[in-house]
């Protein structure tokens, strides 16, 4: 059994029965997320570009790397290129993948694709 409890843009809150490796069935709630790209932009002089964003869920400003949610049919690289330009005004000619992380794996299926952007 799987049901959508709430949906916002491309993110859903899903409740479903999951069979654990021990064959025990539990009800689990997951945030279904399309994935994201996180970019480490480095200027030709070796400086890292960060952005200052207000995060309503924490009610404070945070200094962050540029990042954003993948759009439908968008590759991780395309997302990284788009987000870098949208959030910083910079574009890069060189993107290197650093792999991926799943920072909230206990309750969210989001995969964050990590990139270094150079030649801004």
Language-model segments: which ranges?
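Conserved Nudix-box catalytic region and its N-terminal flanking loop in Nudix hydrolases
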Residues: 28, 37-82
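A short coil-to-beta-strand element that immediately follows conserved catalytic motifs
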Residues: 91-98
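Active-site-adjacent beta-strand/loop module that shapes the phosphate/pyrophosphate-binding cleft
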Residues: 14-22, 104-120
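Acidic pyrophosphate-coordinating catalytic loop
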Residues: 4-9, 56, 101-113
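Conserved hydrophobic "DFG−1" position in protein kinase catalytic cores
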Residues: 18, 41, 50, 90, ...
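Recognition helices and adjacent regulatory flanks at domain boundaries
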Residues: 54-56, 82-86, 90, 113
């Amino acid at each position: 059994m799987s049901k959508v409890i709430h949906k916002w843009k491309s993110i859903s809150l899903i409740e479903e029965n999951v069979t654990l490796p021990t064959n025990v069935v539990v009800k689990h709630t997951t945030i279904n997320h399309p994935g994201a790209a996180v970019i480490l932009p480095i200027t030709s002089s070796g400086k890292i570009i960060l952005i200052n964003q207000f995060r309503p869920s924490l009610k404070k400003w945070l200094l962050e790397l540029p990042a954003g949610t993948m759009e439908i049919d968008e590759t991780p690289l395309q997302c990284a290129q788009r987000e870098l330009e949208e959030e910083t005004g910079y574009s890069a000619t060189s993107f290197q993948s650093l792999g991926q992380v799943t920072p909230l794996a206990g309750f969210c299926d989001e995969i964050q694709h990590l990139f270094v952007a150079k030649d801004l």
